[in-house]
Amino acid sequence: KKGGDSGPSIATGMAVDSFLFNRVESGEMPPEDKNLSRLEIETIRKWIDQGARTASPEPDSISEQYFTNEESQFWAFQPIVKREIPITDTRRALSSPVDYFILSKLRSKRLDFTERAPREILIRRLSFDLLGLPPNSEAIEQFVNNESPDAYEQLVDRLLASPEYGERWGRHWLDVAGYADSEGYTDADTEREWAYAYRDYVIRAFNENMPYDQFVREQLAGDELTQRPYNNLAEEARRKLTATGFMRMAPDGTGSGGVDQMVARNEAIADSINVMTTSLLGMTVGCARCHNHRYDPISQEDYYRLRAILAPAMDWQSWQTPSQRQISLYTEQDNIEKSTIEVRVQEATDERQKVIDKHIDRTLYEELIKAPDELKEPLRKAYQTTASERSEEQTALLKEHPYIQNISAGSLYLYSRQRSRRSDDIEAIAEQREQDAIAGVKQRYLEGLEDEAVRTALAQVLEVASEQRNEEQKLRLAKHQPLLVTADTLSQFNAEEARLVADYRKAAEICRNTDARKEMDDLQKVIDSIRAEIPREYFIRALTEPENHQPLTYLFKRGNHSS
């Protein structure tokens, strides 16, 4: 009433003389385009004309207390109390105390309960309500024909004992908790592989009728209820740690690349606080993150006091990414079994590597067959020299022969697919080499004859096809056995070349009949089958406090994420 520089803003009982009302009626207030309706303006006028009364006396000065006593008495902040059941005159028995409250309200409106629904409708209502599914015909018939006085109670018990009950009603809490199977925050939306365990925990809690206070405690502090270290966990310990997945349902981009880590961490904390308060307090506190809440009695100081409770487990300056927060469910026995199997895996892997090395050596030999004789040994040495130790000449030589340079464990599949063509090439080389060797034996023998006339005569006979030679020519050649050399007798005159041709032909046969790809795949399947025996390692997506960790508490200012 004292007012400011312009005097009192309200003239009690006289709106027409009130500075505040005149400003509102003229449209000067509220500012900009937030104009009040005629009805709202009339309400203000009546309030001033009727004395401008307030719920409580206005203080002479504003205290440091941010919230009034009236705000602190808001109904949602009051402890739960057991109400007296209203006494209501009823002509029929009521089945639940809740019915008395309902009937009392109905009577205040001059209403009453409708007639009791027939059993066919009751079982449908119950089934849809508790399971979200309609009853089948057998269940309906059984309930309708059940003459027991507690038939309804029996039906309720049967539906509550159904696994579908937890699935039906657990999903409502999962919605409140913001359950998600992926991290969100980024477009990658990384999968949360182990989030389902928290979902199953909630469903099981409903099905086992877990007390609500225990349900809340385990979700907020399951790690504090579990003895460290988190090894060889018993079923109860697993349950409590799994329950803390409640505090891990907020979007978390800290495990993704390309994000501002400080922003992502603080957003994850803020979203977790939002999940906790909206579900357990029934109110949003996000406004108090940057300033005192404008509508609810939540100060910015209170917000960061609440955040400080979470700081040991969610320390933005010593952050743990989603993968770092996982708790392994591997037992000591699992580790022993895994180690034993991994020894077998390594043995099978070593055996496969021996086969790979054998195929690499074989493929190198086959490719060297196709190279000129004078380059065979240089190419072999160049290939067998490690890349970092090769000379420039060796590197250049291999570059000119890519089919040798590219031989590796990874490329054996390609060489295996081409084995038919490669074996034909090797066979052709062996054939040509054999013919050249036979011709060489004959040529060297003729050159060794001293009598030129004999040499000339024998050369002329050789020009005649063997099937067209006469007896005289055959007798003449019979006296000079080297000139009758064939593939079968080549070893008598050039053993080294005959052996080489035989090796080439054997290599061609092996190349044609050896499927390196299949052999390596079969060995890999053996390795995979052994590795599949390793017990699968499951994890708990939990929120835990690092041991001996006491972070500092910060009061952030708007937009400040890093100081």
Summary of predicted features, one role per range:
Residues 64, 232-233:
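Short, solvent-exposed loop/turn elements at beta->coil junctions and helix N-caps
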Residues 1-223, 293, 313-444, 452, ...:
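Aromatic- and Gly/Pro-enriched helix-to-coil junctions and flexible linker segments
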